[in-house]
């Protein structure tokens, strides 16, 4: 019995790892399609969050992830008031999956796909109980960066791309489900902490201060939470090297 249990656990782990990689690739698809559609960073983040949240309620076997992704993009555009035409979403996504191809003809296949996107959008709304508006880390990170820039040595700040790195880390975090497992303030602090670490930049007087700089920004956060988020980010980048 123990051998059978171990085999089942191994199969479950392999299946889970496969699912994580699929979600990674589909999240990248959402991000790249979003950029081609001219979406801003917050609507793209909302689309990724809707996608990840939807698959917390169901499994990949039940719904086509690329259809869910297109519907998430369409819905996110409405939520964030950056409305997108289904025709544009369909054509951008079609070209993403079929590089160099011509736009789809407006025929029965096109209208069937359009109807599927709309029906999937309604399904997602029902499954998520119409809770599709989210607080993202973006506004917190912007505030923290401005505060830290005024706090730090100007030369140290200007010679290292801390802000650029922090924004890139935040964007890449949406390849996984960090947005569902941590508070937005925690993610904002963690990506900033990681960016500072990457460039070896120290926050002035932090070692002598009674309160660490990250607790000034988010008083409930701990170094353990920061390290857990960084560990998850490193796992995302490791996965990126493994996925062709």
Curated annotation (Swiss-Prot):
<dbReference type="InterPro" id="IPR013763">
    <property type="entry name" value="Cyclin-like_dom"/>
</dbReference>
<keyword id="KW-0195">Cyclin</keyword>
<protein>
    <recommendedName>
        <fullName>Cyclin-Q</fullName>
    </recommendedName>
</protein>
<dbReference type="InterPro" id="IPR048055">
    <property type="entry name" value="Cyclin-Q_first_cyclin_box"/>
</dbReference>
<comment type="function">
    <text>May be an activating cyclin for the cyclin-associated kinase CDK10.</text>
</comment>
<dbReference type="GO" id="GO:0016538">
    <property type="term" value="F:cyclin-dependent protein serine/threonine kinase regulator activity"/>
</dbReference>
<dbReference type="Pfam" id="PF00134">
    <property type="entry name" value="Cyclin_N"/>
</dbReference>
<dbReference type="GO" id="GO:0006357">
    <property type="term" value="P:regulation of transcription by RNA polymerase II"/>
</dbReference>
<dbReference type="GO" id="GO:0005634">
    <property type="term" value="C:nucleus"/>
</dbReference>
<dbReference type="InterPro" id="IPR043198">
    <property type="entry name" value="Cyclin/Ssn8"/>
</dbReference>
<comment type="similarity">
    <text>Belongs to the cyclin family. Cyclin-like FAM58 subfamily.</text>
</comment>
<dbReference type="InterPro" id="IPR048053">
    <property type="entry name" value="Cyclin-Q_second_cyclin_box"/>
</dbReference>
<dbReference type="InterPro" id="IPR006671">
    <property type="entry name" value="Cyclin_N"/>
</dbReference>
<dbReference type="InterPro" id="IPR036915">
    <property type="entry name" value="Cyclin-like_sf"/>
</dbReference>
């Amino acid at each position: 019995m123990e051998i059978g249990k171990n085999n089942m656990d191994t199969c479950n782990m392999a299946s889970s790892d496969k699912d994580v990689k699929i979600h990674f690739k589909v999240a990248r698809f959402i991000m790249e399609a979003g950029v081609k559609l001219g979406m801003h960073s917050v609507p793209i983040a909302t689309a990724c969050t809707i996608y990840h949240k939807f698959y917390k309620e169901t499994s990949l076997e039940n719904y086509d992830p690329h259809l869910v992704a297109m519907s998430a993009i369409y819905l996110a555009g409405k939520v964030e008031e950056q409305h997108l035409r289904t025709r544009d979403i369909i054509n951008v996504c079609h070209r993403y999956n079929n590089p160099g191809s011509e736009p789809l003809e407006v025929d029965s296949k096109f209208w069937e796909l359009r109807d599927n996107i709309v029906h999937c959008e309604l399904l997602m709304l029902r499954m998520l109980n119409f809770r599709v508006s989210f607080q993202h880390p973006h506004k917190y990170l912007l505030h923290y960066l401005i505060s830290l820039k005024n706090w730090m040595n100007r030369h140290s700040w200007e010679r290292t791309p801390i802000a650029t790195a922090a924004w890139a880390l935040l964007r890449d975090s949406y390849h996984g489900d960090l947005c569902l497992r941590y508070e937005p303030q925690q993610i904002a602090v963690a990506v900033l902490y990681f960016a500072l670490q990457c460039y070896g930049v120290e926050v002035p007087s932090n070692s002598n201060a009674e309160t660490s700089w990250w607790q000034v920004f988010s008083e409930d956060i701990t170094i353990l939470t920061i390290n857990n988020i960084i560990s998850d980010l490193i796992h995302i980048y490791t996965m990126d090297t493994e996925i062709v």
